[in-house]
Amino acid sequence: LVLVDFQKEWTNPESDDFLGDIKQLVQRTNKLIDFCRKKGCKIIFTRHVEKDSVDAWSEKSEGTRLLDELHKEKQDVIITKHKISPFYQSKLDKELGDSEKIIVAGILTNMCVRSLIQDAYDRDFEITVIKDCCATYDKKTQEFTFKDLKATREKIEFLNVKEFVKST
């Protein structure tokens, strides 16, 4: 399970990157984390940090920390990334090892989540995207991103948390 950029900056009302109230998103994501953990999945969190930044996305910023509400445990992997793709110059490939399947959720759907999906697809992963555990700034962008990915990468599975739990 790869959880992309569930960071505090998205929940800061003073931030240009504020997504609004994402409590329900976090609750659904915690259900996903708990379910995957019970199934023995490796849990990987990514966090976006801009290398030369001195603002909200800098290493020292509270905004780049993972959300406290997430069900994190000591054995979970946290990968700091510096570009849109979680694969780019990170240890994600190494952490995924010989896995053939990847479950994806995260923020922003149309940016880092999409980039992860595209790069995982090009690496021949079997991909399941948990739609209701992804978020971006507006519904139209969210829907277009999923529609476009479906149209261009037919093998990707798109489910909500309830569907995923039932099918697994």
Predicted region positions:
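Active-site acidic carboxylates
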Residues: 1-77, 166
